[in-house]
Amino acid sequence: MIVEVARVLASSKNAIAFTGAGISAESGVPTFRGKDGLWNKYRPEELATPEAFARNPKLVWEFYKWRINKILKAKPNPAHYALVELEDMGILRAVITQNVDDLHREAGTRNLIELHGNIFRVKCTKCNFKEYLKESQRLEEVLKEDLPKCPRCGSLLRPDVVWFGEPLPREELDRAFKLAEKADAVLVVGTSGLVYPAAYIPYIVKESGGTVIEVNVEESAITPIADFFLRGRAGEVLPRVVHEVRRLLQ
């Protein structure tokens, strides 16, 4: 089946990738409901909502600092790099991700749409200030503060991620949907397909006549519409697919 998938991609002009937590789990990024005891006693709804932040911003920031420190130790894995290779070959138009861990960017993905934000970006709760902490060199400073403040207006900063009950960023979602409408193939990697509206993406590709290729360790909500289901870890499966694509294009 790897050969058949490679054939689809090799002849594709407008493929996209749609990625979820599974691709990052292989890099050691803890999933939200991971087994780390420290935050297990809290439900995600108690930490990742606007209400939780209004009630106890210090606790929410402690949780996000813990996550940031965990993610800083993670490195992109072969699956991230395989997607970069497909982009370099001119096959992949964009990577649309539900992940906030910045690993696609670190791997070298150029056209990246982050539907759920980025944990290394902060935004002000009052004014329109935003900052990508890896670029501004202020990451260490922010991690040391109990309650990071906006350098422009002094109000509280918050992580620039989408919390439960918040809408997805309109611009990113529109871009993602437009790409999906034009896509002739979508690589669905490591997502449960349960979080909407992001999970509409494979369905849009399917309805527009494109091929749905799923790479996952287990079947998901997307599997019933997948034309190809490659069972396995993305870090093992995707490099094999890319190798085959290269062979076909030689």
UniProtKB/Swiss-Prot annotation:
Its EC number is 2.3.1.286. Keywords: Cytoplasm, Metal-binding, NAD, Transcription, Transcription regulation, Transferase, Zinc. The keyword NAD applies. The active site is at 116 (proton acceptor). Binds 1 zinc ion per subunit. GO terms for molecular function: histone deacetylase activity, NAD-dependent; NAD+ binding; protein-malonyllysine demalonylase activity; protein-succinyllysine desuccinylase activity; zinc ion binding. It is found in: Cytoplasm. It catalyses: N(6)-acetyl-L-lysyl-[protein] + NAD(+) + H2O = 2''-O-acetyl-ADP-D-ribose + nicotinamide + L-lysyl-[protein]; N(6)-succinyl-L-lysyl-[protein] + NAD(+) + H2O = 2''-O-succinyl-ADP-D-ribose + nicotinamide + L-lysyl-[protein]. It is an enzyme of class 2 (transferase). This is NAD-dependent protein deacylase.
